[in-house]
């Protein structure tokens, strides 16, 4: 009997500690998402935008598929994330299958042959597409995190 009481006490303490850790993690992720969203809106650098997007995707990966998920919206976001990753994946400094960095790299290599407005348009495309992705994931996760 004494053992059962001690065991239940230990389990209760562990349960409380785990619950608080989960709440702290949720708060930390929520705060980080807010910071990343602000940085995404303020940044004018394509590389920074891509870095922010990958960090937001990492947070999204932690929470997707959990209870209270909107299956249709997650399917749309998963499609956007996979498309983004496919276009921006870099392996050993080399873009996989060209992608966005292939376009930007080709533009940078042929900088003298490509008009400045075309280079600027390509960079603006990268920045705007990453901002849209970050905003979509941010809106979805913030709505989902409010439920907890």
From Swiss-Prot:
Chief subcellular location: secreted
Q: What is the protein named?
A: Protein Turandot Z
Which cysteines pair up through disulfides? They are none
GO cellular-component term (any): extracellular space
Q: Give the record's family classification.
A: Belongs to the Turandot family.
Q: Which GO terms describe its biological process?
A: cellular response to heat; cellular response to oxidative stress; cellular response to UV; innate immune response; response to bacterium; response to heat; response to oxidative stress; response to UV
Q: Where is the signal peptide?
A: 1-23
Please name the Pfam families in this protein's record.
Turandot (PF07240)
What organism is this sequence from? Answer: Drosophila sechellia
User: Where is it located?
Assistant: Secreted
For this UniProt record, the keywords arranged alphabetically read as follows: Immunity, Innate immunity, Secreted, Signal
Function (record text)? A humoral factor that may play a role in stress tolerance.
- For whether the record's keyword set contains Signal, the answer is yes
């Amino acid at each position: 009997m004494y053992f059962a009481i001690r065991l239940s006490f230990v389990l209760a303490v562990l349960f409380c500690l785990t619950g608080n850790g989960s709440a702290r993690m949720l708060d930390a992720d929520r705060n980080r998402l807010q910071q990343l969203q602000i940085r995404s809106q303020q940044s004018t650098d394509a590389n920074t935008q891509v870095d922010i997007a990958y960090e937001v995707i990492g947070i999204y990966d932690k929470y997707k598929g959990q209870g209270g998920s909107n299956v249709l919206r997650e399917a749309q976001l998963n499609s956007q994330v996979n498309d983004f990753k496919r276009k921006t994946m870099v392996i050993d400094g080399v873009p996989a299958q060209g992608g966005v960095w292939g376009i930007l790299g080709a533009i940078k290599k042929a900088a003298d042959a490509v008009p400045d407005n075309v280079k600027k348009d390509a960079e603006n495309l990268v920045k705007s597409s990453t901002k849209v992705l970050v905003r979509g994931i941010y809106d979805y996760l913030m709505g989902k995190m409010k439920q907890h």
